[in-house]
Amino acid sequence: MPDLLVRSFAPLLLAFQPCFTQPSFRSFWALAGAWILCSGRRSLTRIIQSGDLSQFKHFCSFHRFFSQARWNLDDLGRCVFHLLLPFCSPILIGAVDDTLARKSGRHIWGAAMHHDPLRSSKIRPVFSFGHSWVVLSVHLSFSFAPNKVWAIPILVRLYRKQKAKLAPGRNGKLERKQTGHATAQQYRTRPELALEMIRTVANWVPERKLRILGDSEYAGGSISRHLPANVELISRMVMGAALFEPAPTKPSRLGRPRKKGKRLANPAQMADNSKLRWTKTTLRLYGRSVKVWYKSIDVLWYSSAGQRLLRIVVVRDPRGHRRDDCFFSTDLTMTPSEILTTFSWRWPLEVCFRDVKQLLGFEDPQNRVSSATQRTAPFIFYIYDLVLLWYAQSGHRLAQQSLLQRLWYPQKATVSFEDMLRTLRHATWQERIFSDPALDAHTRKLLKPFVEWAKAMA
């Protein structure tokens, strides 16, 4: 197998060997190294070319690795999950969210028009053609950056729109073929896909508590009413939600027992009620200290969570820069401050989406086959995970050698994924070039500037 990367990266790749047959594992090993070292557009043919993989296998073997080989994405996610457990706290923190990978072309399998949050505004929604991926990640901090939270994707699902009966285009022709759209029997919503992944992770560690973070799309009954016993949900609540007291324990009359008590004020009314005093505090949210006011109460949100009691927290920005908001947790042991602080851990997943798109070419592969489409993009998330794990285990010791000095950014104090990727590439180039004992001192001196230039371009 080609040793494209630094030797300290090999144990991480070997951990995935049980997930593959021997030929597929050799392809996985080669593709992982070539993908990390590749720069520019990352189509599969360019990955093969940049790693010179045609010297190792026929190029068709790497296409078949995604379209025909026998391996399962969830097995890779489980391997990553077990590699992460030594870094995790006793209570696991996870998050679910979706991201859009924009595509172009009539024959892209599973692509459709989806809402594009990056191009949309509050007034004008924008839709883009592409794939919508639902991702479940584990969130944690590493010892080399204890104040920073990282999102590690472990499970990924492709959301497929339901096949439309009619899709007219110009002059009565279809503008795009409906390739890979789900039938009525195959169709599942994004929350249903998220619940499937939550149950999978909960079954991997039934003895551990798992707290799942999600935005308002994942706060509905599709998830909150069907959570496994060891899973708690922290999410955002609409300000107009209908809230109720718990049902009385003793029925006051004959007939069916009540499922909910009397109607309470909704979160918007709670925020405007001057008789309920705000609790004022300062919390560490999104990497900085923020002053917040909040009101908290335990209620039923029957339309979403049924008879499960929730702890809701209505939040106000005392500076008036943000509108009032409301969050809830199914875990009644959490304080309001813990709920708000923990929910802020959801943001690193958005940073992860940005990194895989801009630094690893998440939107670049163009697939026309079902299995290749559902494997190639998630494969990039696992490349992201491997780089993070390598840096946490050994790469952080090499950070000073690979540090890129920016005169316009002297206050930089935390490491980014871009820094990790540069460190891995720099360590690889140094090992591959300078590990040759035949090189004399003069040749090493000549080659050193080229490695530094390559580091600056990485």
Regions found by a protein language model. Give the residues of each.
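Short gly/ser-rich anion-binding loops that grip negatively charged ligand groups
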Residues: 37, 52, 66, 70, ...
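Single, function-defining residue in the core of a domain
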Residues: 1-16, 20, 51, 92, ...
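Active-site-proximal, Lys/Arg-enriched surface segment
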Residues: 68-165, 296-300
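Generic alpha-helix structural propensity
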Residues: 27, 39-43, 57-61, 71, ...
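Short, surface-exposed loop/strand segments
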Residues: 52-56, 98, 215
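Gly/serine-rich nucleotide phosphate-binding loop at the start of the catalytic core
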Residues: 1-67
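Gly/Ser/Thr-rich loops at beta-strand to alpha-helix junctions
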Residues: 38, 100-102, 215-220
